[in-house]
Curated annotation (Swiss-Prot):
When the channel is activated, one or more imidazole moieties of His-37 probably become bi-protonated. The gene is M. The M2 protein from most influenza A strains is inhibited by amantadine and rimantadine, resulting in viral uncoating incapacity. Emergence of amantadine-resistant variants is usually rapid. GO terms for biological process: protein complex oligomerization; symbiont genome entry into host cell via pore formation in plasma membrane; symbiont-mediated suppression of host autophagy. Pfam families: Flu_M2. It comes from Influenza A virus (strain A/Goose/Guangxi/345/2005 H5N1 genotype G). It is a single-pass type III membrane protein. This is Matrix protein 2. Residues 62-83 are annotated as: Disordered.
Length: 97
């Protein structure tokens, strides 16, 4: 009799394991935690850009414009756009020796 036949008894399905203590609550809890961990890891890898962008920037989408007149909204948009615009003619070349 070999050690393999004493420890593990193969079944017909090849996926099942005949363990006398497989109904142990600790084994069941570990299996559930392992499956949940796998599911969360897969979801994290699928949606990591959305998740971490949401954590980094929060739920904010910008300042609220409720109650602000349309003329002030347009002025704010123009200020934001002008802050983004860059004049390409003002570059400085620095040469290191």
């Amino acid at each position: 009799m070999s050690l393999l036949t004493e420890v593990e008894t193969p079944t017909r399905n090849e996926w099942e394991c005949r363990c006398s203590d497989s109904s142990d609550p600790l084994i069941v809890a570990a299996s559930i935690i392992g499956i949940l961990h796998l599911i969360l890891w897969i979801l994290d890898r699928l949606f990591f850009k959305c998740i971490y962008r949401r954590l980094k920037y929060g739920l904010k989408r910008g300042p609220s414009t409720a109650g602000v007149p349309e003329s002030m909204r347009e002025e704010y948009r123009q200020e934001q756009q002008s802050a983004v615009d860059v004049d390409d003619g003002h570059f400085v070349n620095i040469e290191l020796e």
